[in-house]
Amino acid sequence: MATESTTNTTTIIARADQHDIDLHKASDRVNFGSIKEPIDVPYLLGVQTDSFDWLIGSDRWKARVEEDEKNGTNTVAHTSGLDEVFNEISPIENFAQTMSLTFSDPYFEEPRHTVQECKEKDYTYSAPLYVNAEFENGDTGEIKSQTVFMGDFPLQTPHGTFIIGGTERVIVSQLVRSPGVYFDRQQDRTSDKEVFGAKIIPSRGAWLEFEIDKKDQPQVRVDRKRKQSAIVFLMAIGMTKSEIAQAFKDYPLVLDALEKETLETQDEALVDLYRKIRPADTPTPEAGKNLLDSFYFNTKRYDLARVGRYKINRKLGVEADFNDRSLHQEDIIATIKYLVALHDGAATFPGKRNGEDVDLRVDVDDIDHFGNRRIRQVGELIQNQLRTGLSRMERVVRERMTTQDAEAITPQSLINIRPVNATIKEFFGTSQLSQFMDQNNPLSGVTNKRRLSALGPGGLSRDRASMEVRDVHPSHFGRMCPIESPEGPNIGLIGSLATFGRVNPFGFIETPYRKVVNGHVTDEVEYMTADRDLDHVIAQANQELDENGNFVSKSALARVGEEEAVDVPVSSVDYMDVSPRQMVSLGASLIPFLEHDEGHRALMGTNMQRQAVPLIESERPLVGTGSEWRAANDSGDVIKSEKDGVVTYVSADLIRVMNDDGTTSSYKLAKFQRSNQTTCYNQRPIIHDGERVEAGSVLADGPAIQKGDLALGKNLLIAFMPWNGYNYEDAVIISQRLVQDDTLSSIHIEEYEIDARETKLGAEEITRDLPNVGEDAVANLDERGIIRIGAEVEAGDILVGKVTPKGETELTPEERLLRAIFGEKSREVRDTSLRVPHGETGTVIGVKEITREDAEEDGDELPNGVNQMIRVYIAQHRKITVGDKLSGRHGNKGCISRILPEEDMPFLADGTPVDIMLNPLGVPSRMNLGQVLELHLGWIAHSGWDISLDPNMEAEWKKLVPSGAEKAEPNTPVATPVFDGVKPEVLKGLLSTTLPNRDGDRLVGPDGKATLFDGRTGEPYTKPISVGYMYMLKLHHLVDDKIHARSTGPYSMITQQPLGGKAQFGGQRFGEMEVWALEAYGAAYTLHEMMTTKSDDVDGRVRVYGAIVKGDNLPPAGIPESFKVLLKEMQSLSLNVEVLNAEGVAIDMKDEDDDPASSADDLGFNIGARPDAAAKEDQKAEEPEYQ
């Protein structure tokens, strides 16, 4: 057998070597871009994974630190986040400082469960964190050391997400103002004089603000309290008058203020300062000194952070060590000097950088500049939570040091890990920055992980954010995308990291530039932060170069500082952009011809790509931008080979590769799993048995991915033409073919859960034996009462049978006898089965059952009081239908208004019917011409082309066609990179050289238009029509999820009006404006009926229902419940409101026979109840009462 297997292996390898195989490692698109990028796009999820690696000090982070030290660079923080936070808190000392507790060397054990197990069983993917704790008793000199368990710490999956309680979540990076020193200029309210101010903002601690007021006096504000003299503050921190005079000898403004100051000693200054900060307390020099120390000079209370120290050093030209995170006298002196220089209008300020004397530019700071805004990544956000938890734990430790016997104390007895665990759990579960991962498609997942949010704790609030903060800023270039942002109230507050952007150890976003030396562009790439951009002249990436990398023209369009772009001589250019797509995010870089779309529409196109639903059969775009490969590969939804080797086994759910190093790797594929957005997550192998693969080769496609390329929609034949008004106002007409062939069909998987609990009246039971339910209703349930897999179910069908004990009344003797004979079985129960909700349908594809016995065996955890939990998964096959939303990639969205038979659609001369008709009026006013250019290039890619078919051999456009793109077969995918795409003249030329069809005809002319024929009459249309292939997406706004109808259902308890919304099975609101409409028509009876019988006349609606059932005339309406509520509200305002009868006597509005309950009893039915009402009892929306 061994020999045979060896022979087989040899054969396989030989077969793999025989033919030159596509190793699935790069996109096979024909690229029309002319600019070569000197570097690859950085790993798209690096913004998440690198930060978490730093936090936990992983091996990947250690390797990067080693490389950093070897290269002598500073691209990585050299102390891990956990080490930092444990070093900060150590040592914890008691109040007498006779005992101390020190932490060191945190490490993780292996995670208890795999990522897949956590998803299936609702666990949190985490690993136990241990730390070495050392307790020292100063009195005896005794040291006790222990390894202490610090709780389970959530771990990141390889793709930058966290599994919390079984659901996949993402921690979004936060944009915040950086700690440091900031200078500003404001107009004084009373005079027109400019007032200059400075703020020293720490990462943690009190602010310190300086100001030169309208009288030219230097003032200080301590901890946002009252203003006082800056001279007094300098004296309070220990400077004498002579030292102040010496330090500010070149600053007359400060010397004038010093002369006027009457206080002479530090003690007087401290007393004066304390009196103004704490006016209620008795001022003493000691109290003043303690207050100042605790505000600014206590490292436990005040922390500039490394980034704050870096910013202060750069701004003021001081040279303190980055790890020196406290404030010093020199910083305060330099701040006041800079402020005075700013006030005096000086252009430069003397300082030091890298040990050299330099002249720093004096200017006020722009708070919206990306040199002053930094990113708090996932690692730092978790570290801050850990710091909060440990500081709470510190208080507990101090208390225990004083209360416990010193001899018996061990580190374990002092430490209580509950506050630490609670803080981290709260952050992952409820923080604004911990988001339910968007798994709609691979792009939405990547974008979610690259999102930058200015909201959240310590950030802005959307109500107070000004236009300036939201606006696009020049410093965003290459760092944050100017296009991708939400359309609602969060516009400008939530952005996306630019394609080439990366975050440096201080949290500032860097973007790469090519170095230019004497007009020669090198391949040397340098990453720069936004504040360094200002010091250089930077040319655009599309500046023309010759083959040696020299500028072709004598001048170049370049950015100089914050000014508009200007033409400069090429000799003065310092740097050049690395790529035209450097400015935009991944989502925007996927829009072909982005440069021809108006900004708002590009924003919509970018956002709508994230809403595209993965289709049953994915198809990559014919017209792409070249970014599709990277987007799909870095998303984590494709399976890639870990090592070089040969594929030995392929099935739908498993791929096995024999690696060249003799090992074997197995790759499990996800099959028909439910995503967070209920879409179908399914992976398909794209390699064959015997194929050779390299490390990084794509083995299997994920959802919305084809051949390793992102494939969000379908290439469809589009005609821009109106059709009987059915595509008016962005409506879309589609062909029946798209429905029949499942071209735009998708699978959606819903999860339904039910649990059997212990109640006060006994245990609930999962059973097939349900009261008052016929056999046909339980036909698809197995003997346990659970639906069988494969069953087709509709709304109201039972998925899991469950009975709940009813409340018992006093038993009669006969009942007691039956109870004694038959035991518990004769107890009264009610049916609380899990049913398919209203409007849902589908096929059962999976059932998961967890019982308490199973849970105890497997170590699973069921919530308290739950005996059994069952989950049912139902898959829906949704075809495209009228009301669904379709969209292109250019913000051209529309709702399907008609599905025409294929034979009625307009057709080309060879009989090919078009798939979709779009309204041409949707283009000019919206200025998204990218869709028209995509249409033409789509036709070219579909037909194939050969530029030699143009008889003019010297045509200018041919020179612009890149090598390798001279000809192509039909259905060749092409790439037109953003800002470097196909030129209009090339597009025109290619349209005239498309390959003819088998009849030798070119159906579309050089102008991109074709003669179309009316499908109904066969007559040609009078004018040629733009026809071509466009990539269309089916968005997640599906009519099946939105359509809703109500007959009778739940009512609000207070107003007795029907609830609103599909989730509550609510009614249509007949609002104020609708009432006006009926008033305008004088439809008095309809209006009266709407506001009484059809709404909240409780008794009337029951009687009307009865009258309709019995065929009687409708009874007169009663008094609406909301009118009674209004009376009660007026009475609660102490207004005496009474109802008088004809004789003028006050009467009660509720009559004896005005009882809805008795009316319902008389009729023998209850109109407010629904079959699945019992199942929804737990959902108390607005306290519904079933009337």
Swiss-Prot record:
GO terms for molecular function: DNA binding; DNA-directed RNA polymerase activity; ribonucleoside binding. Keywords: DNA-directed RNA polymerase, Nucleotidyltransferase, Transcription, Transferase. Signal peptide: none annotated. It is an enzyme of class 2 (transferase). It holds the Pfam family RNA_pol_Rpb2_1. One of its GO terms (cellular component) is DNA-directed RNA polymerase complex. Its EC number is 2.7.7.6. One of its GO terms (biological process) is DNA-templated transcription. The keyword Ribosomal protein does not apply. Gene3D superfamilies: 2.40.50.100, 2.40.50.150, 3.90.1100.10, DNA-directed RNA polymerase, beta subunit, external 1 domain (2.30.150.10), DNA-directed RNA polymerase, subunit 2, domain 6 (2.40.270.10), RNA polymerase alpha subunit dimerisation domain (3.90.1800.10), RNA polymerase Rpb2, domain 2 (3.90.1110.10). InterPro entries: DNA-dir_RNA_pol_bsu_ext_1_sf, DNA-dir_RNA_pol_bsu_external_1, DNA-dir_RNA_pol_su2, DNA-dir_RNAP_su2_dom, DNA-dir_RNAP_su2_hyb_sf, RNA_pol_bsu_bac, RNA_pol_bsu_CS, RNA_pol_bsu_protrusion. PROSITE patterns: RNA_POL_BETA. The keyword DNA-binding does not apply. Residues 1173-1187 have a biased composition (Basic and acidic residues). It catalyses: RNA(n) + a ribonucleoside 5'-triphosphate = RNA(n+1) + diphosphate. Residues 1150-1187 are annotated as: Disordered. The RNAP catalytic core consists of 2 alpha, 1 beta, 1 beta' and 1 omega subunit. When a sigma factor is associated with the core the holoenzyme is formed, which can initiate transcription. Belongs to the RNA polymerase beta chain family. NCBIfam families: PRK00405.1, rpoB. PANTHER family: DNA-DIRECTED RNA POLYMERASE I SUBUNIT 2 (PTHR20856). DNA-dependent RNA polymerase catalyzes the transcription of DNA into RNA using the four ribonucleoside triphosphates as substrates. This is DNA-directed RNA polymerase subunit beta. It comes from Bifidobacterium longum subsp. infantis (strain ATCC 15697 / DSM 20088 / JCM 1222 / NCTC 11817 / S12).
